[in-house]
Structure formats: C-alpha cells, structure tokens
A protein has these predicted regions:
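Basic nucleic-acid-binding alpha-helical/helix-turn surface characteristic of O6-alkylguanine DNA
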Residues: 1-87, 138-140
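Pre-recognition alpha-helix immediately N-terminal to the DNA-recognition helix
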Residues: 61-65, 92, 130
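Residue-level signal for inorganic ion chemistry
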Residues: 66, 80, 108-109, 131
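Histidine- and aromatic-rich ligand-binding microenvironments
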Residues: 70, 101, 116
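Regulatory, non-catalytic segments
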Residues: 88-103
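Extracellular LysM carbohydrate-binding repeats and other cell-envelope/extracellular binding modules
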Residues: 103-105, 111
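…primarily DNA-binding HTH/wHTH and HhH modules…
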Residues: 114-140
Length: 140
C-alpha cells in the first residue's frame, strides 16, 4: 500500500489524478475488500498492513511516531515533536503530518492542537472530527 486518502473534499477524479501524478509507474486498483481488513486492523490494533512510505527522513520519523497512537487515544503536535526528540519543531511536525500519504492507516487524525482544538486535516476537519468521535476519543 503506497497511498490512501479520502475523496470527499476534492472528488474521486482529482484524488486519483494526484496519485497518478506522484506514482507514474504504479498500477492503480480499487480494492474495497482489502480496505475493510486494513480499516479493521487500524481500529483494533490487530493485523498487519504492508506499507511503503516515501518521504524525507524527518517525515518518516514523524509518520512512524503516529503509528504508535492507539485507536481511541489522541495526542498533540507538541507531544509528537517531543517524542521524536525535536521539541522545538512543532510546526515542522504539523507540516509532515499534513503530508501523510496513508490517511487513516498512519493515524494523523489522532493529533490535535495543544489547546484541544482539532487543527487541520488534509481531507477536511469534518472528517477528522467524525473519525475521532467514531473511535471514542473526541466528544466535541
């Protein structure tokens, strides 16, 4: 799995075009039965998902830190920055999180502002809120 996103904000064709532009040599496929098992693995914390992530060294460190946030938990951008030993790089952490190529699989939606605000979300704040409510970690 190299990419996973949501199409509600930009539409299916625009999302597909974005992936094709980035991954010119890859064959794309809609695979709903596989997606269900991936979603279950993320929600339960059980199961394996073979992923291939491409990013800068800093981005991959941030994305790996996100993989340690269990379903039902939330954290902050500053907590992630501290966990990767870059406590002053909160904005850079936010930028790296915003570039997450595997929405939901790498659970960037579980990161909030220190104030408790939702912050941004690449696929829309409404979707971020809905996922957090579903996971039981957000009541707002």
């Amino acid at each position: 799995l190299i990419g996973l996103g949501f199409t509600n904000e930009i539409g299916y064709l625009a999302a597909r075009q974005e992936l094709v532009k980035k991954w010119r040599q890859v064959r794309f496929r809609i695979w709903p039965e596989r997606l269900e098992s991936w979603v279950n693995a993320v929600l339960t914390g059980k199961g394996n998902i073979e992923i291939h992530i491409v990013g800068t060294k800093f981005q991959t460190i941030v994305w790996q830190a996100l993989m340690h946030i269990p379903s039902g938990d939330i954290t902050t951008y500053s907590d992630i920055a501290e966990s990767i030993n870059h406590p002053r790089a909160v904005r850079a952490v936010g930028t790296a999180i915003g570039q997450n190529p595997l929405g939901f699989i790498i659970p960037c939606h579980r990161v909030l502002q220190k104030s408790g605000g939702l912050g941004g979300y690449r696929w829309g704040v409404k979707l971020k809120r809905a996922m957090l409510v579903y996971e039981g970690s957000y009541k707002g």
